[in-house]
A protein has these predicted regions:
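Patatin-like phospholipase A catalytic core
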Residues: 198-202, 208-233
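SIR2/sirtuin-family catalytic core signature
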Residues: 1-20, 25-35, 41-54, 194, ...
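Active-site periphery "cap/insert" segments of enzyme catalytic domains
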Residues: 2-4, 8-11, 20, 58-211, ...
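Acidic, metal/cofactor-coordinating or nucleic-acid-engaging core segments within structured domains
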Residues: 48-52, 229-284
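Amphipathic alpha-helical scaffolding segments
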Residues: 25-34, 164, 220-225
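Extended, charge-rich helix/loop segments that form flexible
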Residues: 85-98, 102, 106-115, 222-257
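Short coil/turn segments at secondary-structure boundaries
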Residues: 23-24, 171, 215-217
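Short, flexible helix-coil linker/hinge segments at the edges of structured domains or between repeats
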Residues: 173-188, 219-235
């Protein structure tokens, strides 16, 4: 039975889904580009040409590091270039404020830019949905992990991933989508806060179960841009678009509505329901959690790092487990090289002093590094390997006083 007096915050990142079959960045990009080339409207409208131009321009811009032109940066560029459109006769509210300083210098039509961005979202959603149906590994260890958390505390799982491996492993976790309709559920913010002490799973950046419930019989409770939860992935993907017109931003541009959040302006998109409630709740979760577990996150989402920092700046700091992957599962060897954005964030945002060799204890258990002073532990052999070694995990929790 769940222990209501103790809370565990679990933050899930992209690396946690790779073991189950979500493609890594290189393969994901290749699959995305195949989808774009198969999208007839994208081809006819010049969207594929726009995608190639943006990607090639970014690759040249990044010089010796062309891989930095990844799909999130490409999408962001396409979206912002399309948004930087000046409409004749527009009132100041709808004139991009930076237009006179940053007039776009390209020959691409607005239609092509929007078609490319639209096709990218559709492709990303499809790849995540298809991959969710074909798990590469058994979900049993993940099921056991969630059950183990529930035996000792109230686990609140916040994931930045679109896939549904966690809900497959443990169906029925609370999501906040409690207003039942014929074929879908709508989000209820009051229920999200009322059910604060029940185990939950919350998709911070969207899900393969999210869609826009427009069309058919009008629902008086559905406004433009509202998202619904569809139990069937096959049904949800039919509703990936249809959120209506874009949402106005204060700088005179528009934010295109989408069932999933990608690109570099994630924080701006979190104002949409249910994300507004989820993000508001997350800032409370980090302060009430008795233990924080970060799974497979490269710590690239700065708005989430800011939340985690709140808990790690307390005295004493909230205990934290960080599960990642380093070559050969050897964090100590990896630290002999240059620090990366990930390891820098571990030091500054998670407050794990991994560079202090006097405090770090390596190898007390296979794959683990522990800093008892910081009440922190790092697992370096990947998420699926972590799931298969519950005995070591239990001992580590004792070491960091969690």
């Amino acid at each position: 039975m769940t222990n209501p007096s103790k809370r565990i915050l679990v933050l899930v990142g992209a690396g946690a889904s790779v073991d189950f079959g979500i493609p890594q960045t290189k393969d994901f990009t290749a699959a995305l580009e195949r989808e774009l080339q198969d999208d007839q409207y994208c081809l006819e409208s010049g969207g594929w040409e726009a995608y190639q131009w943006v990607k090639n321009t970014l690759e040249k811009y990044y010089g010796d590091e062309p891989w930095e032109a990844h799909f999130e940066r490409v999408y962001h560029s396409l979206h912002e270039l399309a948004a930087m459109k000046l409409i004749d006769g527009a009132v100041p509210k709808y004139k991009p404020v930076l237009y006179p300083f940053l007039k776009p210098e390209h020959a691409l039509e607005d239609r092509a830019l929007r078609a490319a961005a639209h096709a990218m979202l559709k492709a990303i959603y499809k790849i995540a949905s298809t991959s969710s149906a074909l798990s590469k590994h058994s979900l049993n260890p993940l099921t056991a992990f969630i059950k183990g958390l529930m035996e000792n505390a109230v686990p609140r799982i916040y994931t930045t991933n679109y896939d549904d491996f966690f809900s497959q492993a443990y169906p029925g976790l609370f999501t906040g989508f409690t207003n039942k309709r014929d074929g879908y559920n709508l989000f209820n913010p009051k229920d999200y806060w009322a059910e604060w002490n029940v185990p939950g799973l919350f998709h911070l950046h969207g899900s393969v179960h999210f869609g826009f419930p427009l069309g058919g019989t009008p629902d008086p409770d559905v406004d433009i841009g509202d998202l619904a939860w569809y139990e069937s992935r096959e049904e949800a993907i039919k509703h990936v678009h249809g959120g209506g017109s874009g949402k106005a931003r204060l700088d005179g541009t528009q934010l295109e509505r989408s069932a999933i959040i990608t690109g570099l302006d994630k924080l701006g998109r979190l104002q949409q329901s249910p994300y507004l409630s989820y993000y508001g709740g997350l800032t409370r979760e980090v302060n009430e959690a008795d233990l924080i577990i970060v799974l497979g996150s490269g710590l690239g989402d700065l708005h989430l790092n800011t939340c985690l920092l709140q808990a790690r700046r307390t005295c004493p700091p909230t205990p934290i487990i960080y599960v990642g992957w380093w070559k050969d599962g050897d964090l100590r060897e990896a630290l002999r090289g240059d620090l990366t954005d990930q390891t820098i964030a571990m030091v500054h945002d998670l407050r794990i002093d991994i560079c202090n060799r006097a405090q770090m204890q390596f190898g007390s258990y296979p794959g683990w590094a522990v800093n008892t002073n910081a009440r922190a532990a790092i697992y370096a052999k990947g998420f699926y390997s972590f799931l298969q070694d519950s005995a070591s995990f239990a001992q580590i929790l004792k070491q960091i006083e969690a």
